[in-house]
A protein has these predicted regions:
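Surface-exposed amphipathic alpha-helical tracts and adjacent flexible/coil segments at the periphery
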Residues: 1-21, 25-35, 48-85, 94, ...
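Short glycine-enriched, charge-decorated loop/helix-capping segments at active-site entrances
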Residues: 35-41
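Glycine-rich, highly charged phosphate/nucleotide-binding loops
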Residues: 42-47
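Conserved nucleotide-cofactor-binding alpha/beta core module
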Residues: 123-124
Length: 706
């Protein structure tokens, strides 16, 4: 298997830079629906020309439609996808479940890739993506070589991994920091990169504990090829074209020669861009402080070197398509020229019948010289054979015309758009909103939050992390409420037997439902006699996504908390829907344990990731930003960290606004609250008190996310 090198194309110049520097494929966006809306991107006409430019040179084009979209946006996205199909795009990257379902209906012949924004990080998640018809999965950047190897070995579809470029602190597709703090949604391509700002602990914002160095896995290219990784991806649609050229050229050589980089190549990668050096941490299975770094404000681009790079790729003659030319010139027959490329395309063109020479006859060498003049085209004459009868006269113009026609037909063949089925977009069926008031549900984070006083208030559901259920005695509460086991949104393939056992034990204790937050959770819950609920980590943004997950077996679902009130109201709710109306909104889930990085922790480095530590970090200081806002850091499965918003979403005094949106459930999300605080909040939402906590926010309920 040949490993593909995939390079970023944030604009036309970056596209040329990537192609001329050796990329096998490029990924790009056009229109409004891609994960880098701030990049230059492409208009419809530019995209069509870009696809032809790439296909002529044997380079594939992948369109990024990997953002979440609203119901009102879905028709426009469908139109963009149809245009892309008509242009001959090779594949489309998707994140949104509604987009996935829509594209499979309107352009069923276009391959779809699961974007890293889908948060796929386990073998089961990849296998589910294959079951759903996707042909490639882009894995989370946080996976180690061993985890990647296992997935590659057993995956029924192609695996793509990031090999170079920026690392997000949060798992892709799960970051809400930019949206909640500044309305700029990272899951909608508008991330403001708040992770690069100063933060700290103990009330001081004196460091950059969320700013990871760029990844550089160049030393592991041969190993990744041998693991069976189908595609190595370079990050950088927001970076300069010269950067794209420099990095692509080096990785292309490493792949071509199946080797590790030289010291000089590593220096060039660092010169192109770095943040206090690079990191290999996640790939090597290492987490810790050494992975973090910043780029000095006074850092400058290497303009002299970049000028040299730019001068090379602007000539556009570094990436030529080699052709084998075979010319036959026989007396009494039309001249014929056959051109064949390495991809199996063959064209044959004919010209005039040559005349007998009146003076000097043309030679085979002269014919070959004329045919090899491919300058100004994307072709080179790698081989040229001439079969020539003696005593014939052929003009230079006739040979030039023969060559030009052959190259034009070859270009037409290489850029031909495949015939594909295209269907009209049909909006999801409208389902009338539920007229009743939503039932209140509660989500717990700690065992002590479950109390008799809380259950006495009769919440409709209680969501509990599956790992906490073993600590709880549910028997006094059974029959008074429903308990749902919440699976961790981030885990590992090797954790699945543990999680399955926990679910089976939970069912024996009276738990009647499972809340899933990742595609890989579906196999874990299959076969259990329980309800399936779609949790907020699924990022359910539109009616098509709700319909998709209903088909996967969900009986209810929580919609994205990025949606504003009107957007929630307008959803066609084909299954009972829930929205979060209270609590600290989750901002990030991170592979690095922030408390361990700050204070040190032997558990972080000395025990299996699937075993919870003793919880000493639960009382660690909160994260503090430049404005003095404090963000609680909670412990998540596998000693990961979950950063919560400093402000608490509070809508008890706005009950008429969320009770009239057609919701079946309204969730109170408890994280740092004590047992008594949980009771007080539930009473407030039941209208029994008017007590509100300090430092509240309305979240995105009235304003939505960009």
């Amino acid at each position: 298997m040949t490993t593909e090198l995939l390079a970023p194309a944030g604009g036309q110049e970056a596209l040329v830079a990537a192609v001329q520097s050796g990329a096998d494929a490029v990924y790009m966006g056009f229109g409004a629906f891609n994960a880098r809306r701030s990049a230059r991107n492409f208009s419809d006409e530019e995209f069509r020309a870009a696809v032809s430019y790439c296909h002529l040179r044997g380079v594939k084009v992948y369109l990024t439609l990997n953002t979440l979209v609203t119901d009102r946006e879905l028709p426009a996205l469908a139109a963009e996808a149809r245009t892309a199909s008509e242009c001959g795009v090779d594949a489309i990257l998707v994140q949104d479940w509604g987009v996935l379902a829509t594209l499979q209906k309107i352009i069923p012949d276009v391959p779809l890739h699961a974007s890293t924004q889908m948060s796929l990080h386990t073998l089961s998640g990849v296998q589910e993506a294959a079951r759903l018809g996707m042909t490639r999965a882009v894995l989370a950047r946080e996976l180690s070589r061993g985890e990647i190897a296992e997935i590659c070995q057993k995956s029924p579809i192609e695996i793509e991994t990031f090999v170079h470029g920026a690392l997000c602190m949060c798992y892709s597709g799960q970051c809400e920091m930019s949206a909640v703090i500044g309305r700029r949604s990272g899951t909608r391509g508008a991330c403001a990169q708040p992770c690069r700002l100063p933060y700290g602990f103990s009330g001081r914002a004196d460091g950059h504990p969320l700013s990871l160095k760029d990844a550089n896995l160049a030393p592991f290219v041969p190993e990744m090829m041998d693991l069976g990784v189908a595609c190595l991806k370079i990050e950088g649609r927001m970076k300069r074209p010269e950067y794209v050229a420099a990095v692509t050229e080096i990785y292309a050589r490493l792949l071509r020669e199946h080797r590790t980089p030289t010291k000089d190549e590593q220096k060039k990668l660092a010169l192109a861009f770095s943040r206090d050096g690079f990191t290999e941490g996640y790939y090597r299975g290492v987490r810790g402080r050494e992975m973090f770094g910043t780029r000095p404000e006074n850092a400058r681009w290497p303009e002299d070197w970049f000028s040299e790079i730019r001068a090379r790729y602007e000539k556009e003659n570094l990436r030529l398509v080699p052709l084998a030319l075979n010319c036959t010139i026989r007396a009494g027959q039309p001249m014929a020229l056959t051109a064949e490329d390495l991809d199996g395309h063959t064209v044959t063109v004919t010209g005039a019948v040559p005349e007998a020479a009146r003076s000097r006859a043309v030679t085979a060498e002269e014919v070959e010289t004329r045919l090899r003049k491919t300058g100004g085209t994307a072709f080179s004459a790698a081989q040229c054979a001439v079969a020539l009868d003696g005593g014939l006269a052929v003009s230079a113009g006739a040979l030039n015309a023969l060559r030009r026609e052959a190259l034009a037909q070859m270009e037409a063949q290489r850029t031909a758009v495949p015939k594909r089925r295209v269907f009209d977009f049909v909006p999801p069926t409208i389902v009338k909103n539920d007229a009743g008031k939503p039932l209140l549900t509660v989500s717990l984070h700690r065992a002590e939050q479950l109390s008799e006083e809380l259950i006495a208030l009769a919440p409709a559901r209680v969501y509990v992390p599956v790992e906490l259920l073993a600590q709880l005695d549910l028997s006094p509460h059974l029959g008074r409420t429903e308990f749902f086991a919440v699976l961790p949104r981030i885990y590992r393939t090797q954790d699945e037997p543990i999680l399955r056992a926990l679910l089976e034990d939970a069912a024996k204790k009276g738990v009647t439902g499972v809340s899933i937050g990742n595609l890989g959770h579906l196999p874990l819950a299959r076969g259990l006699d329980c309800k399936l609920h779609g949790g907020w980590p699924l990022n359910l943004y539109n009616s098509a996504a709700l319909a998709f997950w209903k088909e996967q077996g969900l009986s209810s679902a929580c919609v994205s908390f990025e949606l504003r009130d009107a957007q929630i109201r307008d959803l066609s709710k084909c299954l009972p829907c829930e929205a979060i109306v209270y609590g600290r909104l989750p901002l990030m889930v991170t592979e690095n344990c922030l408390n361990a990085n700050e204070s040190g922790c032997r558990y972080f480095t000395e025990r299996p990731a699937s075993v919870l530590c003793d919880g000493a970090c639960a009382s660690a200081p909160e994260l503090t930003d430049r404005r003095g806002e404090h963000f609680p850091v909670l412990r998540a499965w596998g000693c990961r960290s979950e950063i919560e918003n400093g402000k608490i979403l509070y809508l008890a005094d706005k009950s008429k606004d969320w009770q009239t949106l057609g919701l079946r459930f309204a969730q109170l999300r408890f994280t740092t609250e004590s047992a008594s605080e949980c009771v007080r909040v539930l009473r407030a939402y039941q209208g029994k008190t008017v007590e509100a906590p300090e430092n509240i926010t309305r979240g995105l309920f009235y304003r939505g996310a960009e």
